[in-house]
Amino acid sequence: MKLKNTPLSVAVLTALSSFAYANTADSVKLDVVQVVSENAGAKSKTNVVTLKDLQKSTNEDLRGVLSAEPAINFGGGNGGTSQWVTIRGMGQDQIDFKVDNTSSDTPVFHHQSRFMLDPSLIKRIDVRKGAGSASAGIGVTSGSIEATTVDAKDLLEEGQEFGFKLNAGVSSNKGHSQGATVYGKAGVVDALLSGNWQTLENYKGGKGYSNKDGSDVVKNSALGQRGLLAKFGVDITENQRVVLSHRQEQYHGERALREEFDFSQSYLAGTSKDLKAGQKLSNVFAGKDRRGNDTYYILDANGALIANDATNNPRYRITTQDTTNLEWSGKNMGFITEAKANAYRIETSRKEPAENSTTRVLTHGANLDLDSEIGESHWLKYGVNYRHQEAKPNSIQEIARDRATGRMVATGVKRNQQKEDVGLYVEGIWGFGPVTLTTGARYDHFKFKANSGKTVSHADFNPSIGLIWQALDNLSFNTNLNYASRSPRMFEAMLAGNTLRDVSDNLRAEKARNTEVGFNYDVTKNISLNGSYFWQKVKDAHATKANTIVNAALLRNQGYELGGAYKQGGFKFRVGVAESKPETFTFNNASLDHAVFAVATGRTWTTSVSYKFENPSLELGWKGRFVEGETGTPSRGSNAGSAAIKQSGYGVSDFYANWEANKNLMLNFAVNNAFNKNYKSHSQRAGGNSLAGAGRDFRMNATYTF
């Protein structure tokens, strides 16, 4: 695609600094998004998933909708609150998840996923990889997944004032879903109400999976889910719009305490102190426990080994996330070409009725993002970001029982944790013929209040620079160097009421540097290629020592992504490959949980082949995901000690058919994991007790719109 020296072409530089956000009502911005997505290598991709994609698929979680991205991997069995995600091997505590420019980075519990999203409520998903540029927002050191929810204008056809959508689906392994959406407009006002409900039973693993009870069913994997969205918009003028929305995601079911583990795959082990009535120790050594003691397999009264699933303490749990967001957008306001502002509140809660326990994380924030066109070939982006978070455990316990000694001791906990982040940024986009340059600067400041009562604060300056060279009409090269910082993440809210987590006197933000080179090449009108190679370093990474957060870790990562596509008429073929080599280092006897920082994942290949018939309107296709074997370091509870272990490679094939029966009815069919592969994702804790992927799954869903 040729880039001309126009206001459109200069915006390609957002590919180096951040990806663009499209307003489909504005053809200029839509053109910019197309240019950006065609000239960003693999670092930033817009419209990775669109409303149209979601309507013609059976996918009901992020794992499914982002399956074409080889650099993004999901662990955690059938998902929900066990759905762990990595981007280029960087774990969930190093990446961000945003919906409608709202976000929270505080974990409720380290054995639970931080990401909650129902794809049925989404219009589009964009992906950012590596450290973000100045305009990327707070704490984008290793990438982000950014979603935009649907509104009435996205669903109403021209001339339509009211609409209704019904959807229902069924899965053989094992679940069903149903949902409804109503939307309409009257004058300058539009509104949407949407709800989706999903019921998942305990799923079956692939061929050959069996737990120690002799079953092919993964225990404690059943889950009920619901997603609700209410959205109201007002077009104040032709150039200004206000939208108020409230979104809720909720998961409930009897889940394991450590949701990313399936302990029924191993036998119960312990010391003599762990024995219950009728039990005895065998003479078979089972390894060291967390305190370094020798453990042996435990036998029941009949001398038989005992499946270990009770250790995971399954119980009924409700996890809910409520987000309220007020957004304003405007354009053509003198020097300010475009503007967007929002203020939001997020409440994430984890309730365990049997324990009468409720843990909450409260977040409120605001963003102001301004764009100004300067002359014919330049663009200026500037703004401010603010976020405040508070972790509220079920209670503050100044005295509690020590898990190691069993004695009542002072915890040192005095208050709830709080954190405040403020960021200011400016970013220039400068077009000079075939070359487009971007320069940016970001100032970030945090104030952290630990549960010990201690407060620390620190500020960072983060520059960014990038370049796109349109070498030929169909060939462009890009490079960028981005710095970003991340403030200390608050200690998991569920344990913060009786577990001290202090902060060192001179605690600083983590500092990430990401260098990347890439290309985009349209070989012909039918064949396209893209690729990137990156180097990343995160210094002053946060670790713990003596229950204190310290700057005593280093993260390094490097790797590449390559992608290619061919299309001819109704035929499409895509292939992609990604490989990364993240490493973590700790100093001064500090420790960290590797699985939430960086995860060793094997080289990943994604492929897809499809053909779209015009009459009938039918698409048939195949998608494959193939992960090569990799050596990873297991985490606590993996029953594999601390030595590196080999994670097996695997390949999973999905077949699908999408039939648009008429303009109102869409029918989707799929066979996921068609060959019933028994596999374990690499994007979770390594070891024998990590969750197995779901086995063969026949799916069908229908969407009716009128």
Task: Annotate each predicted stretch with a short phrase.
Residues 2, 6-11, 21-23, 221, ...:
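Conserved C-terminal beta-signal and adjacent last beta-strands/turns
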Residues 310-333, 413-419, 456, 470, ...:
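Outer-membrane beta-barrel signature, preferentially recognizing the C-terminal barrel domain
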Residues 241-249, 313-482, 530-533, 567-569, ...:
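Face-selective signature of the C-terminal outer-membrane beta-barrel domain
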Residues 25-157, 174, 259, 323, ...:
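Acidic, small-polar-rich N-terminal luminal/periplasmic segments of exported/outer-membrane proteins
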